[in-house]
């Protein structure tokens, strides 16, 4: 019986070869699908680095002459002062934990700002979080030293920026990485003595752009820069 079975297999070796080839192709395709699904789910379930539970977004624009409450002659300084008044009133409500201003950098935002600075001669490029200090408390960012979001809010100043700890990891030629960045004073935009310089005042855990962005992707590396009144005024004029 075994001899007849082996003989039959040998006689049908050509058709069996095609069958094995088909099975191999199906196996490769299934393996690829499983691998893609596994990697996608693994990335999806990684820590986001922020928390949006019970957060709300308010968007403001300047009134045009077509608005019923439009007041001609108002200056940008007055509009920015009114914006701060809205923020202060919201922040003093007992059911509100924190309120911040930001420009084009809330979680899951469709757009983003870019930023660059130099570590010695190495240009480092990342996303830009253009924010006021309370932003860290609103979205509960985490300081790498374990001190929480309050310390990050205190660290962000017009002369001091806050970075994600992994911001320079993809730049192998950079002289400093990770915790070594803390306290460095670096030129931004241009590597020249007269360029604006900012201090690296604090580092946060990696913050992902969305659920499908890995922690080492461009969208998960950022620099948080103080959103000044002057910047708000210039944004309102554009």
Which residues are covered by each model-predicted region?
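A short amphipathic helical element positioned immediately N-terminal to and/or at the very start
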Residues: 2-10, 86
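Membrane-embedded glycan transfer/ligation machinery
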Residues: 3, 18, 51-53, 129
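Alpha-helical scaffold elements within enzyme catalytic domains, especially in hydrolases
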Residues: 8, 89-90, 135, 180
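Membrane-helix entry/capping segments
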Residues: 11-12, 238
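Short, strongly hydrophobic transmembrane alpha-helices
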Residues: 12-42, 50
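Membrane-proximal extracellular/periplasmic loop immediately following the first transmembrane helix
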Residues: 37-123
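Mid-to-C-terminal secondary-structure elements
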Residues: 104-238
């Amino acid at each position: 019986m075994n001899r007849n079975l082996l003989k039959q297999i040998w006689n049908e070796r050509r058709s069996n070869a095609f069958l094995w080839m088909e099975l191999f192709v199906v196996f490769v395709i299934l393996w690829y699908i499983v691998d893609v699904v596994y990697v996608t789910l693994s990335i999806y379930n990684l820590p986001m680095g922020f928390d949006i539970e019970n957060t709300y977004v308010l968007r403001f624009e300047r009134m045009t002459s077509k608005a019923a409450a439009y007041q001609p002659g108002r200056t940008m300084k007055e509009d920015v002062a009114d914006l701060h008044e809205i923020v202060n009133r919201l922040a003093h409500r007992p059911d509100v934990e924190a309120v911040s201003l930001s420009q084009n950098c809330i979680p899951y935002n469709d757009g983003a700002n870019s930023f660059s600075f130099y570590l010695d001669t190495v240009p480092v490029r990342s996303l830009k979080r253009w924010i006021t200090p309370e932003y860290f408390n609103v979205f509960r960012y985490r300081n790498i030293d374990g001190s929480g979001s309050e310390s990050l809010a205190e660290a962000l100043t017009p002369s001091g920026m806050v970075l994600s700890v992994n911001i320079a990891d993809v730049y192998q030629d950079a002289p400093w990485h990770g915790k070594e960045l803390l306290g460095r004073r670096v030129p931004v935009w241009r590597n020249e003595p007269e360029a604006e310089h900012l201090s690296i005042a604090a580092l946060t855990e990696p913050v992902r752009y969305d659920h499908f962005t890995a922690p080492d992707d461009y969208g998960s590396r950022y620099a948080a820069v103080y959103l000044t009144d002057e910047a708000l005024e210039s944004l309102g004029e554009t």
